[in-house]
Amino acid sequence: MDNLLRHLKISKEQITPVVLVVGDPGRVDKIKVVCDSYVDLAYNREYKSVECHYKGQKFLCVSHGVGSAGCAVCFEELCQNGAKVIIRAGSCGSLQPDLIKRGDICICNAAVREDRVSHLLIHGDFPAVGDFDVYDTLNKCAQELNVPVFNGISVSSDMYYPNKIIPSRLEDYSKANAAVVEMELATLMVIGTLRKVKTGGILIVDGCPFKWDEGDFDNNLVPHQLENMIKIALGACAKLATKYA
């Protein structure tokens, strides 16, 4: 047990150069059955790890849980032990409800740092930016599958339920043309840059936080679009695994 990573509970030798990360451990199970084959590795707390085999390539799929503090633990253990590329595939809310609807897919090139962890690692002026090769590969995989996607900036916020004491800033970010909101991508991008690990993100919309009171939210993601997001992410991981082995 001593040679296992403290939280992921896998060994350094089991970490692949390319890793696909998701928030929900249940989504790991949905992803692994799309692969050609897989090997279950570990499940500790919110961190479930599976070795995936897809299109002749091997890479991990690991869940990181909800929010910046827990996901940072996952990302640090991956980055410090051999990961070279990490892609986050997750859900998000639309900040442009007239354009980006529930079930749409967004590939993000950068994120707004409304988390806390990244500000404890580097000054607030430091950007949260993904790697262009990862971003480009995700977009090309979407094109190959004939799946339309949006591109844009995500707001990564530690706050899910707002309080009246301090107003949410999502309206401001919407006016500034940020595309979507989620909770972990900025943390990944900052840690990736600091650790010289390439990062990227692909997200599926579950609703719009501005319209929750109108019923614009469904935790059961649009099934065929969830499948499309998974296939895009897996395809990108396979392509990148040939380059960053």
Curated annotation (Swiss-Prot):
It catalyses: inosine + phosphate = alpha-D-ribose 1-phosphate + hypoxanthine; guanosine + phosphate = alpha-D-ribose 1-phosphate + guanine; 2'-deoxyguanosine + phosphate = 2-deoxy-alpha-D-ribose 1-phosphate + guanine; 2'-deoxyinosine + phosphate = 2-deoxy-alpha-D-ribose 1-phosphate + hypoxanthine. Changing V73A: Slight decrease in catalytic efficiency with inosine or 5'-methylthioinosine as substrates. The keyword Glycosyltransferase applies. It is an enzyme of class 2 (transferase). Changing R45A: 1300-fold decrease in catalytic efficiency for inosine as substrate. Loss of catalytic activity towards 5'-methylthioinosine. Transmembrane segments: none annotated. The active site is at D206. Phosphate binds at G23, D24, P25, G26, R27, R45, R88, A89, G90, S91. This is Purine nucleoside phosphorylase. The gene is PNP.
